[in-house]
Each structure stands twice: as C-alpha cells, then as structure tokens.
Swiss-Prot record:
A GO term from the CC aspect: ribonucleoprotein complex
Gene: rpmE
Biological process according to GO: translation
Stated name of the protein: Large ribosomal subunit protein bL31
Cofactor comment: Binds 1 zinc ion per subunit.
Top-level taxonomy: Bacteria, Pseudomonadati, Pseudomonadota, Gammaproteobacteria, Cellvibrionales
Subunit structure as annotated in this protein's UniProt entry: Part of the 50S ribosomal subunit.
Keyword Electron transport recorded: no
Function per UniProt: Binds the 23S rRNA.
Residue positions binding Zn(2+): C16, C18, C37, C40
Keywords, ordered alphabetically: Metal-binding, Ribonucleoprotein, Ribosomal protein, RNA-binding, rRNA-binding, Zinc
Cofactor(s) of this protein: Zn(2+)
Length: 70
C-alpha cells in the first residue's frame, strides 16, 4: 500500500448565521459558514408552519360537491 495517501483529518468549526458554532472534524482545512443549523431551523425549533395543501380532489369537491345529479 502507498504511504501517506490519506487526506489530513482535522478539527474545524461550522459557524451558523444565528451565531451557533458547531465543532466537528473534516478533511476540509478551513472553517465554514452555514445558513441554518439545528438551533435555528424551524423543524428542530418547533416553530414550523404547516401549509394547508388541498389537492385536486378537494378543489373539485369544493366546486362541484354541492351539485347533485338528477
């Protein structure tokens, strides 16, 4: 096997836009900036908004559900 072909695996920081710093290890040599993390993402914070996404059948029933066939 060849010697020293593995990349360097060192410590790095991932800084979120909310100010949270995540310390991790990576082959990437520099610190990175991320947009969202588990501290500020709506799914993890519980502030997620649910949109009422009615489908095509709901729309059809709303338009034509009151009409009765003879």
């Amino acid at each position: 096997m060849q010697a020293d072909i593995q990349p360097n695996y060192g410590d790095m920081n991932a800084t979120c836009s909310c100010g949270n710093v995540v310390k991790t290890r990576s082959t990437l040599a520099k610190d990175i900036h991320i947009d969202v993390c588990s501290e500020c993402h709506p799914f993890y914070t519980g502030k997620q908004k649910t949109a009422d996404t009615g489908g095509r059948i709901d729309r059809f029933n709303k338009r034509f559900g009151a009409i009765k066939s003879k």
